[in-house]
């Protein structure tokens, strides 16, 4: 995008600020909200590299700060199935027509979000025969398109009914899995001077955003948190379909 440098920096800082208020509040959606404008400003490779590290910083902070809410057994199971799915997704990327898979994925996310926004959400956790395919599917989508978070949230919203537990565990999942993407970006040589400049200017709005997100998290009740979660899922699914 042919804008003056200071305007591009300002827009980038605004994207980091707004998206990470939501990231700190819910434990997810920061990447979904910040990647599109950052791609327009700096291109897809640099955008994904710097936003992934910024997201990792927030998630690592939330994981440590809220470690008493982490279900280690559940977290281990999630990461195991996600990693298996990611490996399959990386393989399938070259043999499956993404034009068929992406709309189906988007419709699934929109359907789940609308069901829980318009109807009374189920209080039961997903049965094992549904939970495992959902986690594997989230890993496959993430391995293929680096956007499996929405399907993962479908599982986590069912498994963790408390807003503190949900946020702590979803942040913990991304703290671990984003290390894989960070290593890949490092191997591509994306951690260059431009990367560290963007990371540096992103820290100031990031710190303020995390502070505000935590404040809002403590102020809202569980029902409002649930509606926000499914509202973000609806937005994610809609963006996939566009």
Protein language model features and the residues they cover:
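Membrane-interface helix termini and inter-helical loops of multi-pass transporters
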Residues: 1-3, 90-100, 185-197
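Small-residue-rich hydrophobic segments that form or flank transmembrane alpha-helices
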Residues: 8-76, 134, 139, 150-206
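Residues within membrane-spanning alpha-helices of integral membrane proteins
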Residues: 9, 52, 105-109, 113, ...
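Membrane-interface helix caps of multi-pass small-molecule transporters
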Residues: 21, 25, 37, 87, ...
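Membrane helix-loop-helix hairpins that form the core translocation module of multi-pass transporters
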Residues: 45-118
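Hydrophobic alpha-helical transmembrane segments in multi-pass integral membrane proteins
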Residues: 92-93, 98, 102, 141-147, ...
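Alpha-helical multi-pass membrane helix bundles of inner-membrane/thylakoid proteins
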Residues: 116-138
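Interfacial loop-to-transmembrane junctions
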Residues: 210-232
């Amino acid at each position: 995008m042919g804008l003056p440098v200071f305007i591009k920096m300002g827009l980038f800082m605004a994207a980091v600020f707004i998206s990470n208020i939501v990231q700190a509040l819910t434990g997810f959606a920061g990447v979904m909200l910040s990647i599109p404008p950052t791609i327009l400003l700096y291109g897809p490779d640099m955008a994904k590299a710097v936003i992934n590290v910024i997201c990792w910083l927030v998630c690592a902070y939330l994981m440590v700060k809220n470690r008493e809410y982490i279900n280690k057994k559940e977290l281990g199971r999630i990461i195991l199935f996600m990693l298996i799915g990611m490996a399959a997704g990386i393989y399938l990327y070259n043999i499956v027509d993404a034009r068929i898979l992406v709309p189906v994925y988007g419709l699934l996310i929109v359907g789940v979000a609308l069901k829980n926004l318009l109807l009374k959400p189920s209080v039961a956790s997903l049965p094992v025969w549904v939970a495992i395919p959902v986690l594997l599917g989230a890993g496959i989508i993430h391995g293929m398109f680096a956007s499996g978070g929405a399907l993962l949230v479908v599982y986590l919203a069912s498994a963790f009914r408390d807003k503190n537990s949900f946020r702590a565990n979803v942040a913990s999942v991304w703290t671990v899995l984003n290390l894989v993407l960070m290593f890949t970006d490092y191997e591509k040589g994306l951690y260059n001077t431009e990367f560290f400049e963007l990371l540096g200017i992103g820290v100031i709005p990031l710190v303020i955003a995390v502070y505000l997100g935590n404040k809002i998290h403590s102020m809202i009740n569980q029902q409002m948190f649930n509606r926000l979660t499914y509202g973000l899922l609806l937005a994610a699914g809609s963006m996939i379909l566009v």
